């Protein structure tokens, strides 16, 4: 078996046009895979310089392989099983700014640099007032980026054609707005002056993005077989699902510079990210939250098995297509395609997604992912959505604890205040009291849900049915 490097494998040399903060699994399986496809199919002709955002990371392993690695895509594509391996060659080099500060700052001096892409976790986009301009480097990611931008501004004497296009991928709603605000805070803190501020405002663009791809990461259990198949000793293989979506809130002139559409990729440039954020939360996360307790209390442990179950599968379909989809404001055909993609992802034969892992903090999840849909549905249709109501009753039942019919334990996990409340309510043995107490817990919902017409009665009816007939019979009654 060969080592993987540019001596043993082909690596194309391309102009360095992208600075990427982050060397983790997600960026390598998502952004770098996208850039690889743009190079191959849309003549993008760009390479990436990776910057490790924190002092300790994985760039030594990456550099040991000359930044070559494979992406293993697994899942269903239009019903067909796919399990592919692709060598990604887009990263030219990887730097640690803590030990290579000069080389890091020199990136700003390269005239062809055009893009900055980051994923430094949700905590990464934060202002740290202890950062100084002369730090080598500033400790926060926005601090490092401001150092780089200011050096570029000075190097090219405020040349308006040398601005950078910045795409943060951190999982924060309107991440671009947050990053921009933080850079303004550093401009203020470090007294970088109005001229630089004007250059940043006019020559650079920081755009909000929404990313979506499940990336399990390094394939520990399959790695021996993968290496055998590749005949390379690749220690940076990254596994991901086939589905990918990148929504970028930016004008068409930015899209023209980043021609992902020409490579047939699911990268959308849109005037507003908000409806896509809402679509993901509603049609991907929303069904997850209600299918999990329904599945588990029906004796099903894995999301894929829930989708394939003759009763629970129909329940999931009803919640998605007949209830939640009716509450969104995007074109119907687009929503249906997205929902079918979601079901294909839930059905992934390679990922054993345990429903219990989704059950963590179910009440706050229902509040953000399903409650808005329940209210909108009631408003638009004049009646309650049966599946979403049953989902709430299933969560309440799950929090009773105990054991399933097959002897498996039911172990809820949530904020202590919620756990204590449910324990106390179920101790009464009275489903009317349980319902009223849960719906009236304003510390969970921010309001009293007993005031929603018909909700308390419908939840109690479901709780009684689950106790008397079991979960599957209760689900059958609404299909």
What is the predicted role of each segment?
Residues 1-479:
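Substrate/ligand-engaging "lid" and interaction regions
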């Amino acid at each position: 078996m060969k080592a993987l490097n540019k001596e043993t494998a082909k690596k194309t040399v391309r102009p360095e046009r992208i600075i990427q903060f982050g060397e983790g699994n997600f960026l390598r399986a998502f952004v770098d895979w996208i850039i690889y496809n743009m190079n191959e199919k849309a003549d993008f002709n760009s390479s990436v310089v990776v910057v490790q955002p924190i002092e300790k990371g994985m760039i030594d392993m990456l550099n040991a392989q000359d930044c070559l690695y494979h992406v293993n895509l697994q899942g269903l594509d239009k019903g067909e099983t796919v399990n592919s391996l692709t060598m990604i060659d887009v990263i030219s080099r990887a730097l640690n700014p803590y030990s290579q500060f000069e080389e890091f700052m020199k990136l700003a001096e390269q005239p062809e640099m055009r893009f900055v892409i980051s994923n430094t976790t949700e905590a990464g986009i934060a202002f740290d007032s202890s950062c100084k301009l002369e730090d080598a480097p500033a400790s926060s990611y926005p601090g490092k980026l401001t150092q780089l931008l200011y050096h570029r501004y000075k190097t090219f004497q405020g040349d308006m054609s040398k601005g950078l296009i910045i795409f943060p991928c951190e999982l924060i709603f309107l991440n671009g707005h947050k990053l921009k605000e933080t850079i303004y805070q550093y401009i203020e803190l470090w007294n970088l002056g109005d001229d630089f501020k004007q250059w940043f405002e006019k020559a650079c663009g920081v755009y909000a993005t929404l990313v979506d791809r499940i990336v399990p990461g390094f394939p520990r259990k399959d790695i021996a077989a993968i290496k055998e198949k590749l005949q390379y000793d690749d220690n940076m293989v990254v596994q991901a699902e086939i589905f990918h979506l990148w929504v970028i809130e930016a004008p068409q002139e930015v899209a023209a510079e980043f021609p992902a559409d020409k490579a047939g990729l699911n990268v959308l440039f849109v005037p507003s990210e908000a409806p896509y954020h809402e679509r993901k939360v509603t049609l991907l996360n929303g069904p997850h939250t209600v299918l999990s307790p329904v599945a588990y209390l029906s004796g099903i442990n894995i999301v894929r098995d829930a989708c394939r179950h003759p009763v629970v599968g129909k329940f999931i379909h009803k919640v998605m297509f007949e209830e939640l989809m009716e509450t969104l404001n995007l074109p119907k055909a687009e929503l249906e395609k997205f929902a079918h993609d979601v079901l294909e992802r839930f059905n992934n034969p390679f990922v054993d997604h345990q429903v219990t892992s989704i059950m963590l903090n179910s009440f706050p999840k229902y509040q953000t992912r399903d409650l808005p849909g329940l209210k909108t549905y009631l408003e638009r249709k004049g009646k309650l959505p049966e599946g979403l109501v049953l989902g709430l009753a299933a969560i309440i039942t799950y929090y009773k604890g105990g054991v399933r019919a097959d002897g498996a334990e039911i172990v809820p996990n949530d904020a202590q205040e919620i756990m204590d409340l449910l324990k106390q309510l179920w101790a009464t043995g009275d489903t009317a009291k349980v319902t009223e107490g849960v719906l009236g817990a304003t510390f969970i919902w921010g309001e009293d849900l007993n005031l929603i017409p018909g909700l308390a009665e419908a939840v109690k009816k479901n709780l009684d049915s689950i106790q008397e007939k079991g979960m599957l019979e209760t689900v059958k009654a609404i299909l």
